[in-house]
Amino acid sequence: MKKVPLNCEVCGNRNYNVPKQSNLASRLELKKYCPRCNAHTLHKESK
């Protein structure tokens, strides 16, 4: 497993590094807390 960064879709801030299995082809999408937006927002895997 390697760690991939997650970016907030609202503000673009890179908030989390989460482990991801390398055999998954799709990009990771999680609803996480963003301290900059002060809300739970969708976070997508960045490159």
UniProtKB/Swiss-Prot annotation:
UniProt superkingdom: Bacteria
Molecular function (Gene Ontology), one example: structural constituent of ribosome
InterPro entries: Ribosomal_bL33 (IPR001705), Ribosomal_bL33_CS (IPR018264), Ribosomal_bL33_sf (IPR038584), Ribosomal_zn-bd (IPR011332)
PROSITE patterns: RIBOSOMAL_L33
Cellular component, GO annotation: cytoplasm; ribonucleoprotein complex; ribosome
Keywords (A to Z) from UniProt: Ribonucleoprotein, Ribosomal protein
Family: Belongs to the bacterial ribosomal protein bL33 family.
NCBIfam families: PRK00504.1, rpmG_bact
HAMAP family given in the database record: Ribosomal_bL33
Protein name listed in UniProt: Large ribosomal subunit protein bL33C
Organism: Staphylococcus saprophyticus subsp. saprophyticus (strain ATCC 15305 / DSM 20229 / NCIMB 8711 / NCTC 7292 / S-41)
